[in-house]
């Protein structure tokens, strides 16, 4: 397969410093709102990259479940590869990509586990079958076949026919950012890149060369 000529010339929008909020979280919320209104497919999907105890990088897609003044929240199995990596090295990089808008956002920062109360509250909001799955799946572990997983979920359902409590190995993380970059595709590969970096408790906004 020849990949050399697979390319797009971006021209839909531009990003100027005058259009950017002083606070990067506010800027992110603006762009996320525009992605939702534009009916971007899975606008909250984000790639999370981490480094494990051996220094090997790994990444995967998760769903952003909250953004607030503190940072970016997602939920997972703490015993999964990503959970073990984040516990070993509590830093992460996140990338949102909204091709319909020719935009991406990068986030870097320190990672903390979310308070158990907040993880409990979110878990209670999940569909019943999803809560069963959180108990049934030993995420990232090798299993002999799919039937084993289905049987485990059924067993959890028999044990908890009405209320499924949150497993202790499942909960949230928050990425507390110290760097965000907003990328807007432009013609001739002269893309707009506006970066915010945290310095002495305040945000510095600057333009990067594409």
Swiss-Prot record:
Keywords per UniProt: Flavoprotein, FMN, Oxidoreductase, Pyridoxine biosynthesis
Biological processes, Gene Ontology terms: pyridoxal phosphate biosynthetic process; pyridoxine biosynthetic process
Chain sites annotated for binding FMN: 60-65, 75-76, 81-82, 104, 139-140, 183, 193
EC numbers, comma separated: 1.4.3.5
Bound cofactor: record note: Binds 1 FMN per subunit.
Enzyme class, broadest EC rank: oxidoreductase
Cofactor field: FMN
Residues holding substrate: 7-10, 65, 122, 126, 130, 189-191
Highest taxon listed in the record's lineage: Bacteria
Pathway the protein acts in: Cofactor metabolism; pyridoxal 5'-phosphate salvage; pyridoxal 5'-phosphate from pyridoxamine 5'-phosphate: step 1/1; Cofactor metabolism; pyridoxal 5'-phosphate salvage; pyridoxal 5'-phosphate from pyridoxine 5'-phosphate: step 1/1
Catalytic activity as recorded in UniProt: pyridoxamine 5'-phosphate + O2 + H2O = pyridoxal 5'-phosphate + H2O2 + NH4(+); pyridoxine 5'-phosphate + O2 = pyridoxal 5'-phosphate + H2O2
GO molecular function, one term: pyridoxamine phosphate oxidase activity
Keyword 4Fe-4S: no
Function noted in UniProt: Catalyzes the oxidation of either pyridoxine 5'-phosphate (PNP) or pyridoxamine 5'-phosphate (PMP) into pyridoxal 5'-phosphate (PLP).
Family: Belongs to the pyridoxamine 5'-phosphate oxidase family.
Matching HAMAP family: PdxH (MF_01629)
Assembly mode: Homodimer.
NCBIfam families: pdxH, PRK05679.1
Listed name of the protein: Pyridoxine/pyridoxamine 5'-phosphate oxidase
Gene: pdxH
């Amino acid at each position: 397969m020849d990949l050399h000529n697979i390319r797009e010339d971006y021209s839909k929008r531009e990003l100027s410093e005058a259009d950017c909020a002083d606070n990067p979280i506010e800027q992110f919320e603006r762009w996320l709102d525009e992605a939702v209104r534009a009916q971007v497919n899975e606008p909250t999907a984000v790639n999370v990259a981490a480094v494990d105890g051996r220094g090997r990088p790994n990444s995967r897609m998760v769903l952003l479940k909250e953004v607030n003044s503190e940072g970016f929240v997602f939920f997972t199995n703490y015993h999964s590869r990503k959970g073990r990596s984040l516990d070993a090295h509590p830093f992460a990089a996140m990338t949102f990509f909204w091709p319909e808008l020719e935009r991406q956002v990068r986030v870097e920062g320190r990672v903390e586990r979310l308070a158990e109360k907040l993880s409990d509250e979110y878990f209670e909001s999940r569909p019943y079958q999803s809560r069963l799955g959180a108990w049934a799946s030993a995420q990232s572990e090798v299993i002999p076949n799919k039937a084993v997983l289905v049987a485990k979920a059924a067993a959890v359902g028999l044990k908890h026919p009405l209320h499924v409590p949150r497993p202790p190995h499942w909960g949230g993380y928050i990425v507390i950012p110290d760097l965000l970059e907003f990328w807007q595709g432009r013609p001739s590969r002269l893309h707009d890149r506006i970066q915010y970096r945290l310095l002495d408790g305040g945000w510095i906004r600057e333009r990067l060369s594409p």
